[in-house]
Protein backbone atom coordinates (compact mmCIF):
# COMPACT_ATOMS: atom_id res chain seq x y z
CA UNK A 1 0.00 0.00 0.00
CA UNK A 2 1.52 3.27 -1.14
CA UNK A 3 0.20 6.52 0.20
CA UNK A 4 0.23 9.40 -2.26
CA UNK A 5 -1.10 12.73 -1.06
CA UNK A 6 -0.89 13.97 -4.67
CA UNK A 7 -4.00 11.91 -5.43
CA UNK A 8 -6.10 14.03 -3.07
CA UNK A 9 -8.11 16.46 -5.15
CA UNK A 10 -10.01 19.56 -4.07
CA UNK A 11 -13.16 17.56 -3.29
CA UNK A 12 -11.44 15.20 -0.90
CA UNK A 13 -9.65 18.07 0.83
CA UNK A 14 -12.91 20.00 1.25
CA UNK A 15 -14.61 16.91 2.69
CA UNK A 16 -11.65 16.38 5.02
CA UNK A 17 -11.94 19.98 6.23
CA UNK A 18 -15.64 19.36 6.87
CA UNK A 19 -14.85 16.24 8.89
CA UNK A 20 -12.38 18.21 11.00
CA UNK A 21 -15.03 20.91 11.59
CA UNK A 22 -17.58 18.32 12.71
CA UNK A 23 -15.10 16.58 15.03
CA UNK A 24 -14.01 19.89 16.60
CA UNK A 25 -17.65 20.97 16.97
CA UNK A 26 -18.37 17.93 19.14
CA UNK A 27 -16.18 19.40 21.87
CA UNK A 28 -17.37 23.01 21.58
CA UNK A 29 -20.50 24.43 23.26
CA UNK A 30 -23.60 24.12 21.08
CA UNK A 31 -26.26 25.80 23.20
CA UNK A 32 -26.40 28.39 25.94
CA UNK A 33 -28.85 27.58 28.73
CA UNK A 34 -29.59 29.31 32.05
CA UNK A 35 -27.57 26.56 33.79
CA UNK A 36 -24.56 26.96 31.46
CA UNK A 37 -23.38 25.85 28.05
CA UNK A 38 -24.24 22.44 26.62
CA UNK A 39 -22.14 20.59 24.07
CA UNK A 40 -23.01 17.83 21.62
CA UNK A 41 -22.36 15.09 24.16
CA UNK A 42 -24.78 16.52 26.73
CA UNK A 43 -27.49 16.86 24.07
CA UNK A 44 -26.59 13.59 22.36
CA UNK A 45 -29.21 12.33 19.94
CA UNK A 46 -29.71 10.90 16.46
CA UNK A 47 -28.52 14.10 14.79
CA UNK A 48 -25.13 13.87 16.50
CA UNK A 49 -24.78 10.24 15.41
CA UNK A 50 -25.53 11.23 11.81
CA UNK A 51 -22.93 14.00 11.97
CA UNK A 52 -20.34 11.54 13.29
CA UNK A 53 -21.19 9.08 10.49
CA UNK A 54 -20.76 11.81 7.87
CA UNK A 55 -17.37 12.75 9.34
CA UNK A 56 -16.34 9.09 9.26
CA UNK A 57 -17.48 8.88 5.63
CA UNK A 58 -15.42 11.94 4.71
CA UNK A 59 -12.36 10.45 6.41
CA UNK A 60 -12.94 7.17 4.53
CA UNK A 61 -13.20 9.10 1.25
CA UNK A 62 -9.90 10.88 1.88
CA UNK A 63 -8.08 7.71 2.99
CA UNK A 64 -9.44 5.67 0.07
CA UNK A 65 -8.26 8.33 -2.36
CA UNK A 66 -4.70 8.56 -1.07
CA UNK A 67 -4.16 4.81 -0.54
CA UNK A 68 -5.94 3.01 -3.39
CA UNK A 69 -4.36 2.20 -6.74
CA UNK A 70 -7.63 2.18 -8.66
CA UNK A 71 -10.58 4.53 -8.80
CA UNK A 72 -13.17 1.96 -7.68
CA UNK A 73 -13.04 2.46 -3.91
CA UNK A 74 -12.68 6.28 -3.96
CA UNK A 75 -15.66 6.58 -6.33
CA UNK A 76 -17.88 4.37 -4.18
CA UNK A 77 -16.71 6.19 -1.04
CA UNK A 78 -17.63 9.47 -2.74
CA UNK A 79 -21.13 8.24 -3.55
CA UNK A 80 -21.72 7.14 0.05
CA UNK A 81 -20.20 10.34 1.38
CA UNK A 82 -22.64 12.45 -0.66
CA UNK A 83 -25.54 10.55 0.89
CA UNK A 84 -24.11 10.82 4.41
CA UNK A 85 -23.29 14.50 3.86
CA UNK A 86 -26.82 15.29 2.73
CA UNK A 87 -28.28 13.51 5.75
CA UNK A 88 -25.81 15.34 8.02
CA UNK A 89 -26.81 18.73 6.60
CA UNK A 90 -30.47 17.97 7.35
CA UNK A 91 -29.53 16.74 10.85
CA UNK A 92 -27.48 19.88 11.51
CA UNK A 93 -30.35 22.10 10.39
CA UNK A 94 -32.69 20.22 12.74
CA UNK A 95 -30.22 20.77 15.62
CA UNK A 96 -30.04 24.49 14.77
CA UNK A 97 -33.82 24.88 14.72
CA UNK A 98 -34.78 22.54 17.56
CA UNK A 99 -33.07 23.65 20.75
CA UNK A 100 -33.10 21.35 23.77
CA UNK A 101 -34.18 22.14 27.35
CA UNK A 102 -34.67 25.90 27.45
CA UNK A 103 -31.59 26.70 25.36
CA UNK A 104 -31.59 30.43 24.83
CA UNK A 105 -29.10 30.80 22.02
CA UNK A 106 -26.81 28.86 19.75
CA UNK A 107 -23.07 28.72 20.34
CA UNK A 108 -20.17 28.20 17.94
CA UNK A 109 -20.27 24.39 18.07
CA UNK A 110 -23.69 24.14 16.45
CA UNK A 111 -22.68 26.48 13.63
CA UNK A 112 -19.35 24.68 13.18
CA UNK A 113 -21.18 21.35 12.88
CA UNK A 114 -23.49 22.82 10.24
CA UNK A 115 -20.55 24.28 8.29
CA UNK A 116 -18.73 20.95 8.52
CA UNK A 117 -21.74 19.05 7.21
CA UNK A 118 -22.06 21.45 4.27
CA UNK A 119 -18.33 21.08 3.53
CA UNK A 120 -18.60 17.28 3.62
CA UNK A 121 -21.50 17.36 1.17
CA UNK A 122 -19.82 19.87 -1.15
CA UNK A 123 -16.48 18.07 -1.04
CA UNK A 124 -17.98 14.65 -1.74
CA UNK A 125 -20.05 16.09 -4.59
CA UNK A 126 -16.95 17.73 -6.08
CA UNK A 127 -15.04 14.48 -5.66
CA UNK A 128 -17.64 12.63 -7.73
CA UNK A 129 -17.57 15.32 -10.43
CA UNK A 130 -13.77 15.28 -10.78
CA UNK A 131 -12.84 12.34 -12.98
CA UNK A 132 -9.11 12.35 -13.45
CA UNK A 133 -7.95 8.76 -13.86
CA UNK A 134 -4.44 10.08 -14.58
CA UNK A 135 -3.99 10.43 -10.79
CA UNK A 136 -3.84 6.65 -10.50
CA UNK A 137 -1.15 4.41 -11.93
CA UNK A 138 -2.46 1.91 -14.48
CA UNK A 139 -3.05 -1.59 -13.13
CA UNK A 140 -1.16 -3.14 -16.04
CA UNK A 141 1.70 -1.64 -18.03
CA UNK A 142 0.81 -0.63 -21.60
CA UNK A 143 1.11 -3.41 -24.17
CA UNK A 144 4.44 -3.48 -25.98
CA UNK A 145 4.67 -4.51 -29.65
CA UNK A 146 6.40 -7.84 -30.28
CA UNK A 147 10.15 -7.63 -30.93
CA UNK A 148 10.97 -6.83 -34.52
CA UNK A 149 7.72 -4.94 -35.17
CA UNK A 150 7.30 -1.21 -34.81
Across the structure, where does each feature detected by a protein language model lie?
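Compact integral membrane and secretory-pathway proteins
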Residues: 1-150
Amino acid sequence: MRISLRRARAGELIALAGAVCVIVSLFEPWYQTPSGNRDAWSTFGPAVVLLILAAAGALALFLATITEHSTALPVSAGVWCVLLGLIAVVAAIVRLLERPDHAGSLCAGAWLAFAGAVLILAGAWQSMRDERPSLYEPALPPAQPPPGQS
